[in-house]
Each structure stands twice: as structure tokens, then as C-alpha cells.
Design a protein with these regions (language model features):
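Transmembrane alpha-helices and adjacent helix-loop boundaries
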Residues: 1-224
Length: 224
């Protein structure tokens, strides 16, 4: 075991972890809005709107994240029309292609998490709001959404951790995130065990932080 290599690799891998966290945070923010939008569509009684939202969720939850990244990065770039549009400014960059793939993927899972949370809200809470003369719009934004978010925290916390680990796939399209830098160091030192132990330790630490933040939020916003 080369301890010197592990010590020397740590600062480089720690800096790369910043890229991983950027990928994760931007993807989660965009994915949360996408998830909320499609969760609302899934609750719509219109069968066409409902099926459309279900189709999106089914496709992105039913296919590997790696395939989605490759289709967006390699596949869309082969469409001649897209190369002549403003979209090409974004699609030609590996970073933004990864963000799009991650956001769409986590958005699909988030939509199902939020949909389930909305459905667990007791009708009596909504009826109580209506009896006080509160409009449906205010009830939805001020009562239903906050309750749904609180209800979904445990499941969404797991999704954040899964997404954090999923960002390692960004290295497959040349992004030098934590896994990407680890691969580069391994290619020059030929010592994968030491490098991946350090990288794995950093991933584990980030998981520990995320887990405890979610746990804190659960307690803080507990209905009890």
C-alpha cells in the first residue's frame, strides 16, 4: 500500500470533489423544479397530460443514466440542425450535457417521490383551508407543497445520495470530477487501489454530510 501516493493524491481529489458538488447541486436544483412540474401533471385528471408525465418518468427511470448521458452528449451532437441553433452552445459542452442528463434523470425520480407525497396529504387538511376561505391556489402553494416536501424528505435524501454517486459517470465524457481525476492519477501511477480508496473515502464523507443534513431537516420540520 503506497501511503505517500494516497497523501499526495488527496488534495487533487479534494479539489475535484468541488466539481462533483457543482454537478450535483445544479442538477438537483433544476431536477427539483422538473420533478415538481411533472408531479403536478401526474396528479392531473386529464388522461393525456397524466400519461405524458408518466411517459417521461418511465423513460428516464427505466433506462441507465450512462445511456442517457451518451445519447445527450454523443447523439444530439450528430443532429445537423442542432449544430446551427443556439442550443449548440450548450450541447457542445460536456459539463452542460452532464447537467442536462442528471437533471432529467433526477427529475423523473423526484416527480414520483413528490407525487406520492402529495397523495399522502389528508383531504381534511385541504378542506380545513377551504372552510377558512383560502383559495385553491394559496392552499396548493402554501399548504400542499410544504407538506409534500416535508413528507418526501427521507426518500428525497436517498435520491440525493444516489445522484451524488451517479455524478461519477460524468467522467465518461471527459469531465474531470472526483472519479475523472482518480482515473487520471491511476493512468499515471498504475496504482488503482490506493487512489480509489481515497476517492471512495471522499464520496463516503459527502454521503455522511448529506445524510445528516437531511436528518436534521426531518427533525426540524417534523409535524410533531
Amino acid at each position: 500500500m503506497d501511503l505517500e501516493l494516497m497523501i499526495n493524491s488527496f488534495p487533487k481529489l479534494l479539489n475535484a470533489a468541488v466539481i462533483t458538488l457543482k454537478l450535483l447541486s445544479v442538477s438537483l436544483i433544476i431536477g427539483l423544479f422538473i420533478g415538481l412540474f411533472f408531479a403536478i401533471l401526474r396528479l392531473n385528471k386529464n388522461i393525456f397530460i397524466n400519461r405524458f408525465a408518466y411517459g417521461y418518468s418511465y423513460v428516464f427511470r427505466g433506462t441507465p443514466l450512462l445511456v442517457q448521458i451518451f445519447i445527450i452528449y454523443f447523439g444530439l451532437g450528430q443532429i445537423e440542425y442542432l449544430r446551427s441553433t443556439v442550443l449548440w452552445v450548450i450541447l457542445k459542452e460536456p459539463y452542460w450535457c452532464a447537467i442536462i442528463a442528471f437533471a432529467l434523470n433526477t427529475g423523473a425520480y423526484t416527480s414520483e417521490i413528490l407525487r406520492s407525497a402529495f397523495q399522502t396529504i389528508k383531504p381534511g387538511i385541504i378542506e380545513a383551508g377551504k372552510s377558512l376561505g383560502i383559495s385553491n391556489k394559496v392552499i396548493f402553494y402554501k399548504i400542499q407543497i410544504p407538506i409534500a416536501i416535508r413528507q418526501s424528505l427521507p426518500a428525497y435524501g436517498n435520491e440525493i445520495i444516489l445522484m451524488m454517486k451517479g455524478t461519477s459517470l460524468a467522467s465518461t465524457i471527459t469531465i474531470m470530477d472526483l472519479t475523472g481525476v482518480a482515473k487520471y492519477i491511476i493512468s499515471t501511477t498504475f496504482k488503482p487501489i490506493e487512489v480509489f480508496i481515497v476517492a471512495g473515502g471522499i464520496y463516503l464523507f459527502m454521503t455522511f454530510i448529506i445524510h445528516n443534513v437531511i436528518k436534521f431537516l426531518e427533525k426540524k420540520y417534523s409535524f410533531n
